[in-house]
Amino acid sequence: MDNSSPIYTEFLPISRADMEARGWDQLDFVVVGGDAYVDHPSFGTAIISRLLEAEGYKVGVLAQPRYSDCEDFKRFGRPKYGFFIGGGNVDSMVSHYSVAKIPRAEDEYSPGGIGGARPDRSATVYTRLAKEAYPDLPVILGGLEASLRRFAHYDYWLDTVLPSIAEDSGADLISFGMGEHQTVEIARRLAAGEPVESITDVDGTCYLTDFDHLPEKYVECAGFRKVASDKVAYAKACRIQMDNQDVVSGQIIVQKQSEKYLVQNIPAKPLVRWELDKVYALPYTRRYHPIYESMGGVPAVREVQFSIIQNRGCFGGCNFCAIQLHQGRRVTSRSADSIVAEAERMTHEPDFKGYIHDIGGPTANFRFPSCREQMLRGMCNGGKHCLAPTTCSHMIVDHSDYLKILRRVRELPGVKKVFIRSGIRFDYLMADPDDTFFKELVEYHVSGQLKVAPEHCAPNTLAYMGKPPIQTFNKFKDKFYELSRKAGKKQYLVPYLMSSHPGSTLSDAVYLAEYLYKNHMRPEQVQDFYPTPGTVSTCMFYTGLDPYTLKPVFVEKTAEGKALQRALLQYYEPRNAEKVIKALKMTHREDLIPLLVPAEGRRAVQRSARRAEPAEVTIHNDGTYTVRPNKGRGGRNQSRGTAPARTAGGRQPSPGARFAPNGTAPRKPKNDQQKENTVWKTSKKKK
């Protein structure tokens, strides 16, 4: 191995001064991103900007521009050919809001981890500002946020259906998917003088046109206005979109928006091995730009700085995952030499301590396409999955190539440990008759904890998630702990679990809580289902229908119902006791209360219930009254006071009147819940 591998230190220009330092008067392209500028291949802005640079273009990076006006988009002056824009690694709405729609204060992809550096719907806002700054310049919009909004889509934050982002943003082209092929071809044609309006035949792009200019052959799904008013039409459109995302079998899709028609060309071909190797060998500095140093850097770089991406795509088929509509289901991977060379280069970094945090990708242990048939016929459609509910008989299961790479990296001088943190697909691992990889995974590549994603255990919920049955996870779990014991290691599984996914009833959540209790599992982190654009699960959430069968699906949308399901996943927490008890009573599973609810939690709920019981007020003929609080308010203690004056006509207040224990009228209840908690009993003693 060549120990003279270069360490790259030069960032691309971020200002006019940087341009002038390179002797440039004008840029060819400006790449705009919603994240802080991190020159690392885990960041889309870094890949697109370095790729354009490698093609010979003069490129500047405009990271998290000010969005109050368009002046920041004029920072470099007018670019020669146009803008490439992305919203960031994470959807800006997910970055800004929790699933409960509560604003987040933190943003791992911004300087200092502080939120607010980008606008809501940043991809749309940036595109509009670029068009405002230079109305006649081409603007190509790509990245995750745009890819998942290329069709008319349900927007969870507004609780409505919106048209394609192509219409809303005013972009000339939408580049969906990973984008390298599209970027290079569009840049080449713009540089050759071709008007952007005529660039309508690039695979992996969408554009708006009128009816007279639609392509000759296409499949049409229901238009924006139809899917916004008809949930069956929305579900059918979702299936058409999902069934045409394969590079072999996919067809051009047309969907009418408000006025014009959106045309999605077939997906771009995935990068082949040598192309992936080239992309990941570009001169990334692998760091955040030094302008962020005084602000505490960019937190997101910490986990990826010494991590290696070895593959793209995922045939796992989880219905709640956006990878199918973005990266696609066809898996491609880098060569062993490329991965080892990147690892070797890391060992010369001044901050490297000997630990490579990850060699993985969307799913770490996928290296090749799932079967040979897909190369000829494409991936299976109609909601069929390679791994769920059972492993397809055509599946090629092989960890040997991945294992060879891990062994080579482990042997590099300066490397102490190589971890796998991006997620192991346990059902694929269990389908491998050769357990050599499993043994070495346990012995060498677990940093004390291994993250896995069973997500749930109820058969009904798992089916709607597109996940394998829980029995597969149980076998994996047992073998993991068995191999860990044999290796003399104390290691643990950290399961990812999800509540309130479409199809998950309260009974399903109770079933999951019982499973966790019986298996001595106490998840520290759980999440509610987050309905983001572009997934089958979000379609089910909005329509209440399975898009492949059109059969009804239960969807928990109430805040209380979601809270109960979430509490059951952490049943052992005393703070969740009241919700857990309520859920168990609602599902007639009171038998589980002594098991799932800690004694401390049960006592707290009992105290709370006693405090909520009404006190008894006795009014005496001498104008005084006595209050007998319930046991939670002091047991047998009594308090005396002076009753309010008699009303006109000499009548005592009606039996329904309310009194406070100190003899004064209580404050008016603020809401119905408080009203229920402040009811007082009154009784009048006879003379």
Per-range role (PLM):
Residues 44, 63-257, 264-265:
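Glycine-rich beta-alpha loop elements in corrinoid/cobalamin-binding modules
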Residues 68, 197-246, 259, 268-271, ...:
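Terminal amphipathic helices with adjacent charged low-complexity linkers/tails
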Residues 91-100, 148-150, 180-185, 209-213, ...:
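Flexible glycine/acidic-rich beta-alpha junction loops that bind and position SAM and/or redox cofactors
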Residues 35, 295-322, 347, 355:
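N-terminal pre-triad scaffold of radical SAM enzymes
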